[in-house]
Every structure is written in C-alpha cells, then in structure tokens.
Amino acid sequence: MLVIYFIGSLLASLVSARNAADLIGTWTTKSRQVFTGPGFYDVVKDELIEPRLTGISFSFTEDGHFEEAFYRAVSNPQDPSCPKGILQWQHGTYTVDSDGSIHLNPIAEDGRQLLSDPCSSSKGIYTRYNQTEKYSSFTVDVDPYYDSIRLNLYSFDGSPMIPMYLAYRPPEMLPTGPLQSIVSKKAKRHFDSKKVTPFGLRTLISKDNLVDPNRWLWVGIVMSAMGGITLFFT
C-alpha cells in the first residue's frame, strides 16, 4: 500500500513539474542581475540597458505571452582577455505542446540586439532582433542548495540551459503588445545607423558563463597570463 502511495505521489510530482502554469513569473539566472522589463529595455528611448553582470531572464504570463532578456559574453580566440558582449531582448507569444516543448514566437519588429566588441571598436552595433525559439522540454522544482524555485529549460537539441530561479510572480514585463507605437519618433529615425557606447569589459565575465565547459579553457589562459604578470612585477 505504501509503495502504491509513493509511486502515485512521484507521478503526481512529475506531472506538476511539466505543468505550463508553473512557468508563470519572471525567472533569472543566479547572478540575479538580468531581469525582463523596463530595467533592461527602455522602450521610449529605444535603448538596451547594460546590467552589472551577464545572465538570462525569461518571463511568462498566464495568457500566453513571453519576454526574454539575454546578456552574454562571447569568447575571443584571438585575444581571450578581450571577450565580446551581446545584449538581446524580444517578446511575443508562446505555446506549450502536449510533449512539454515550448515554442516562442516573437513580435518581429520589437526585438533588439546590441553587439559590443570594446577592444576593436569604440561603438557597439544596435540592430533589430527576431529569433523564433523552441525548447524541447522544461521542469520546475525546488533547488535544495539555493532553496528557490528553479526552472530548467532544455534547448531544441535536448541540451540543458543554465538554470533560472523564480524572481517575480506575477512577472515583471513590458507591455505584451507591439511596442512600435511607444518607441519615440527620434529613436525610430536614427535606428538603422545607431551606434552606442560598448559595454564595460569587467561585466563580460561572470559566474553564469563559467558554467559552460567550453569557456574553461579561455578562463584558464587568462588566469595564467594574469599570474605571469603578477609574478613579473613582484
């Protein structure tokens, strides 16, 4: 009898972990510096706002809207001490299929991307961004280490993304409809040729990025180089 009860409870928890309602809220990676909403994208000025550290944030509403904010570092094989940075923001609608996969359908005109290469250019490149996305599955559970509700997303190929933790419920988001009517006319007029100040180099390396094993090699090279410089001057 106890075995049957245990199996039933386990199955119930697994079903709950795939419940689309569990997605509702704003999620962020462990740096807790990147959040969707007006703190990441200023619609009126049409500007992306650089967070203190890199990270990822997703928001989902009960009626099928999403918003995402990415601040990523991209390794530079020619100069590992000089990574590039990318800010990306988009929003739109989402669906959850019966197999647990998530489909994100962004509003094409609203997405924004800022690419910064501070070691080769004094200006960042600001463009529109529109990327339909699919996540093969997701789970929501309680992280025993952080004692927080954790969202585990899996990319289209099944590879896990960096875990995200519940930050707000209800979610912190910009208006879910098209934003082009809000963007100032001045911002629209200069958008196609817009160049902005690049990110600060110190923000492009954070704990979130160290989770990716492919970056450990470059981190090791940078640290070895820094150690050599320290030894030389001591």
Swiss-Prot record:
Keywords: Endoplasmic reticulum, Glycoprotein, Membrane, Signal, Transmembrane, Transmembrane helix. Residues 234 are cytoplasmic. Residues 18-215 are lumenal. It is a single-pass type I membrane protein. It comes from the Eukaryota. GO terms for biological process: 'de novo' protein folding. Residues 1-17 form the signal peptide. GO terms for cellular component: endoplasmic reticulum membrane. It is found in: Endoplasmic reticulum membrane. The chain crosses the membrane at residues 216-233. Glycans are attached at residue 130. This is Protein rot1. Required for normal levels of the cell wall 1,6-beta-glucan. Involved in a protein folding machinery chaperoning proteins acting in various physiological processes including cell wall synthesis and lysis of autophagic bodies. It comes from Emericella nidulans (strain FGSC A4 / ATCC 38163 / CBS 112.46 / NRRL 194 / M139). GO terms for molecular function: unfolded protein binding. The gene is rot1.
